[in-house]
């Protein structure tokens, strides 16, 4: 995979489509959190399906500059989208790539599912797929207790992931407000035709009822699985690709 940097801050891996198409179709991948970046196999899978694939790191996470959650992570994804019509220069040898996005799709899982859903509000985004997404941060305190006994989740992240996330207590607390980076706060603005979600009833971290409730309020499509736990986005994309491809092509 190639590497580039957007807005002088956001590092992204990317792949051009394995086979050229008449129109450039772009997929932006939104990572979960916390976790090590590992969507390279998914990027390769999607590239072979004919898409440009961009896999950015949020500001303040991993290779990117900045402070994590200083801004809503979905804005980082949209900042990447802003830059694409200008072309992309890979960092190792300076090779330049030109593209003119005809259709843009956003895929995210868990924490990144919220980013994907919020990106659907941008008119440039054609469709989004959100896998086991966090749709309402009211679940946060209960979810934290399942991951750590540390009373400060941000402190746990700093200790466990080092500089992988430059996360302050103050920025993490913004999620508790219900207004910051929260799809539920903007559900009335959603276009249900642009959103497809996947979730398992036995997900231990994101309660399925919260996602089902969001789907009912927004009208978004939800494929609810009986089992699967906290579903891996790569698995979902490969297992349900024919269905997802039809959704993209509507």
Indicate residue ranges for each PLM-predicted region:
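Short beta-strand element of the alpha/beta-hydrolase
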Residues: 23-32
């Amino acid at each position: 995979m190639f590497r580039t940097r957007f807005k002088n801050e956001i590092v992204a891996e990317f792949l051009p489509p394995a086979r050229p198409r008449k129109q450039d179709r772009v997929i932006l991948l939104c990572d979960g959190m916390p976790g090590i970046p590992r969507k390279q196999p998914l990027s390769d899978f999607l590239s072979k399906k004919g898409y440009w694939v961009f896999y950015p790191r949020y500001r303040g996470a991993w290779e990117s500059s900045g402070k994590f959650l200083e801004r809503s992570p979905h804005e980082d994804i949209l900042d990447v989208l802003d830059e694409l019509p200008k072309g992309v220069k890979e960092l190792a040898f300076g090779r330049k790539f030109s593209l003119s996005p005809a259709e843009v799709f956003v895929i995210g899982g868990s924490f990144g599912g919220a980013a994907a859903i919020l990106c659907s509000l941008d008119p440039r985004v054609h469709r989004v797929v959100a896998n086991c997404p966090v749709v309402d941060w009211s679940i946060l305190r209960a979810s934290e207790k399942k991951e750590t006994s540390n009373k400060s989740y941000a402190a746990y992240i700093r200790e466990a992931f080092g500089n992988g996330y430059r996360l302050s207590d103050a920025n993490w607390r913004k999620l508790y407000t219900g207004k910051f980076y929260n799809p539920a706060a903007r559900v009335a603005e959603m276009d249900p035709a642009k959103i497809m979600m996947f979730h398992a009833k036995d997900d231990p971290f994101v309660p399925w009822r919260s996602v089902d409730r969001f789907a009912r309020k927004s009208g978004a499509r939800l494929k609810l699985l009986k089992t699967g736990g906290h579903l891996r986005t790569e698995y979902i994309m490969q297992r349900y690709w024919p269905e997802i491809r039809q959704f993209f092509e509507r």
